[in-house]
Regions:
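Small-residue (G/A/S/T)-rich helix-start motifs and N-terminal tracts that mark the onset
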Residues: 6, 11-174, 178, 182-199, ...
């Protein structure tokens, strides 16, 4: 597919992607000075920009040098989500990961992650965390550099109370993923009241529910939907899908073109949320962590597809390729 002068954002997201093969931009001789004065609605995330976000890791570093993140979620029958989120956070380079999950799945989660600290939270009879689930070791959220809540959590009323409590208490960057978004009522006004930076990572269906719209409306203009979600919540919004868009107040929205249809499987969103919280834990700002996270996840997914095929790859295969992407981006 040939486009003239500059990429067009309609070719990079939603149904436009289906009409594009290998995209080639043809130079028409437009002056760079002229292009500098063009106001583009969307920027493309590129490898050089992402790599520049990561500094040298000091030789005298210790595990605390690279941050400590807390991940809350999991439930009976859905413990794999929090395992993948935690593993992705660790592979992103964060120094420490603590996990809280219901007591009934604690042993399975702990056995799946030798490098994470796993705490058992009190649970309801349906196997989800209770509002007063807090284990002694994680009650002080200020002890962490970032928090992720939602993977595999469930959508029962108790889960909503858990999410509300965390939003009210959290003072460090907070990622709301999956069920931490699904428990909100239409156009919930709690998120804008948060005293911490909030990152939301919805797929189109989750954003449609949150915004009280239909999925077709979200997908018809993903950029506008993202902007409206930012305006409604004051959060950084990561609208997942083909041509993932990241938007935040005061920032120009960006679109990501790494990734492939093989990533359209259960668990891929948990991997992305884990990468983003891991990058937040290492000190990246919310918008930077979000745009770097979607690029890294997509590029790792592309590597996994080359190894295994799009049809045969799984979400956990994306995690296996994160270290190689980090080495390519950072040179070490």
């Amino acid at each position: 597919t040939v486009t003239m002068g500059l990429p067009k954002h309609g070719l990079l997201t939603a149904s436009g992607i289906e009409c594009v093969g290998s995209l080639k931009v043809v130079d028409l001789g437009i002056s760079p000075a002229f292009l500098e004065h063009i106001e583009c609605p969307l920027e493309l995330i590129v490898a050089e920009e992402v790599g520049a976000l990561f500094g040298r890791r000091p030789r005298n570093a210790h595990k605390g040098s690279f941050g400590h993140v807390l991940i809350i979620g999991g439930s009976a029958g859905r413990s794999g989500a929090i395992v993948m989120a935690a593993q992705a956070a660790l592979r992103s380079g964060v120094g420490l990961v603590s996990v809280v999950t219901p007591r009934s799945v604690w042993s399975n989660v702990a056995a799946s992650m030798k490098e994470a600290m796993v705490f058992a939270g009190e649970e309801t009879t349906s196997g989800v965390l209770t509002p007063d689930f807090w284990p002694a070791g994680v009650k002080d959220l200020k002890a962490f550099d970032a928090v992720l809540v939602g993977p595999g959590m469930g959508t029962q009323d108790e889960c909503r109370l858990v999410v509300m409590d965390i939003i009210r208490r959290c003072k460090v960057p907070l990622v709301l993923d999956a069920d931490a978004l699904n428990v909100h009522k239409r156009r919930d006004r709690l998120i804008p009241t948060a005293t911490c930076a909030v990152i939301m990572t919805p797929h189109p269906g989750e954003l449609a529910r949150f915004m009280a719209e239909d999925v077709a409306g979200i997908q018809s203009d993903r950029l506008d939907a993202c902007r409206r979600a930012v305006e409604a919540t004051k959060a950084t919004v990561v609208l997942k899908g083909a041509g993932t868009i990241v938007a935040a107040s005061g920032e120009k929205p960006v679109v990501n073109m790494t990734g492939n249809p093989g990533m359209a499987k259960g668990g891929s969103g948990d991997v992305l949320a884990g990468i983003i919280v891991g990058l937040l834990g290492q000190g990246l700002a919310p918008f930077a962590a979000s745009r770097a996270g979607v690029y890294i996840q997509g590029r790792a997914g592309d590597r996994a597809a080359l190894r295994l095929s799009q049809a045969g790859m799984l979400a956990r295969d994306i995690i296996d390729d994160i270290p190689f992407v980090m080495r390519e981006l950072c040179g070490r």
